Regions:
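Membrane-interfacial helix-loop-helix junctions in multi-pass membrane proteins
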Residues: 52-55, 134, 186-237
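Short helix-capping/hinge motifs at transmembrane helix termini and TM-loop junctions
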Residues: 37-46, 79, 127-135, 164-165, ...
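A short amphipathic helical element positioned immediately N-terminal to and/or at the very start
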Residues: 2-17, 214
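Short helix-to-coil transition segments within interhelical loops
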Residues: 93-102, 163, 206
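Hydrophobic alpha-helical transmembrane segments of multi-pass membrane transport/permease proteins
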Residues: 17-45, 59-77, 118, 177-183, ...
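Transmembrane helix boundary and interhelical loop/hinge segments in multi-pass membrane proteins
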Residues: 74-99
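Transmembrane helix segments
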Residues: 28-29, 35-44, 161-204, 208
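Alpha-helical transmembrane segments and their short interhelical loops
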Residues: 101-174, 179, 222-232, 239
Length: 249
């Protein structure tokens, strides 16, 4: 079974790499935005008193680029792939083979996690080499927040795949959810500049908690217990509902 799963995961990896749009939005775009905007907009590299003296390109913008990659995978790539497989009867046919449908689901999750790790590593390393962005001041905290946040976003993606009747619907719903969730995370208005009420609302959203946790870890601070609890709650709730509602056919 382990050998079969390895072959299945390798096939899924090759299929992912053959999707140029998925590779672009999940890997190239976040890294490219970080480097392009960091190099061309002087204000990104200036110390900002409203950010505690940090440069905007350091913790805030770098965290948002990491988040952008994970959200793209969780709300677009993963659910679309699973719904397309269901529409084409791939999951149903797998149920008659030694490789069960659950193995395909696990392979999809594995590929998306690996891609998110690759994109994040490139973002951090190239940001550090090109822009002087500090590496995470608290590496263990960063890994913990990144792992929990990625699990949460992928669980939301599984829920979308579970309830969406078609690939067109899941793509539309995923895109619609992506923009407000990224806004609440601080993509266009950094969280320190948000009105108090909006920032409090953001604290209880999966992307708001994820983004702030990443910023804390990048700045060398421990993530706030509230944000870890919010991420764990969203992951558990959406994961359980997705498992209950997911349809193989």
């Amino acid at each position: 079974m382990t050998k079969s799963f390895g072959k299945l995961a390798a096939v899924e990896a090759r299929l992912f790499l053959r999707e140029p749009m998925a590779v672009f939005f999940a890997i190239v775009l976040p890294v490219g935005l970080l480097l392009a905007l960091g190099l061309t907009i002087p204000g990104f590299r200036d110390a900002d008193p409203s950010l505690g003296g940090q440069r905007f390109v350091d913790a805030p913008f770098t965290a948002m680029m990491v988040l952008l990659s994970v959200v793209t995978l969780g709300l677009s790539v993963l659910p679309s792939s699973l719904v397309i497989y269901r529409e084409r009867g791939v999951l149903r046919r797998l149920s008659t083979t030694p490789v069960r449908p659950g193995a395909l689901l696990s392979a999809q999750l594995l590929i998306n996690v690996v891609v998110s790790v690759v994109a994040t590593t490139l973002t951090l390393v190239l940001g550090h080499l090109v822009l002087g962005v500090p590496l995470p001041g608290s590496p263990l905290a960063f890994v913990a927040v990144f792992g929990l946040g990625t699990l949460t976003v992928l669980a939301i993606g599984l829920l979308l795949a579970a309830v969406a009747p078609s690939s067109r619907v899941v793509q539309g719903v995923g895109s619609t959810l992506m923009f407000p969730l990224l806004f609440l995370a601080g993509m266009w208005l950094p969280r320190p500049l948000m009105p108090e009420i909006l920032r409090r609302i953001s604290d209880f959203t999966p992307t708001g908690a994820f983004g702030q946790g990443l910023m804390d870890a990048l700045g060398g601070h421990a993530p706030q217990p509230l944000h870890l609890a919010v991420l764990a709650g969203w992951a558990l709730a959406t994961g359980l509902v997705a498992a209950r509602l997911f349809r193989w056919e």
